[in-house]
Amino acid sequence: NCTTEGGKTIALQITAGYMSYTGGIVGWADGSVTGCTNKQPLSISANRLGDACRYAYAGGVAGKSVGALTGSKNRGNLTATAICKFVIMGGIVGSADGVVSDVVNVAAVSVPGNPDGVNGALKEKYFGPRYAYVGGIAGQLRIDGTLTGNGDTTNSGAVTIEQMEYSTEDIVAVGGVVGQQLGKVSNTVNSGAVTVSASPAAGGTIAWKVRCAG
């Protein structure tokens, strides 16, 4: 059992690192996480030069969970800007290989756009990912992962993708419960809005695939 209190934003600036794992409670969890609550907003951004940052995993509770993650809640908004080529982000967990059950997310999960337009003064700050797996509970549920509950595994936070890198290879997998689902999902509830209004980071016509679930 553990709790992080709100009031400040956990801000991570990634300048180098092929992979990064960021969570309100723990970055990478090999063991079990039980009865934890995160109340801190989480904001991550990265250096997109070359492969300085390729994979960014982020979750309100855990960035990556290999063991069981149960009975936990997230109340802190998650935001990813100028992010790595891959962003895997969820209200509870970025990517899960184990059992995730009886979890609740009430916070927003977003990849925001440039408020000044795609070619505005803040263009570099809002340079989006090429591949986005984003969900209200889990960004990615791996093939050995299980997400379940008795109606008490819920998401009520909005999931929003506003910015992607311009590329014909861009893929957006977004859902109120899970972004990319490879494992088993059962008895989960989503009441949060899911919105994809992505613009290319540079001008021109955007070409990307959208896969929605939940």
Regions found by a protein language model. Name each.
Residues 1-214:
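Predominantly extracellular/luminal carbohydrate-interaction, adhesion, and secreted-enzyme modules
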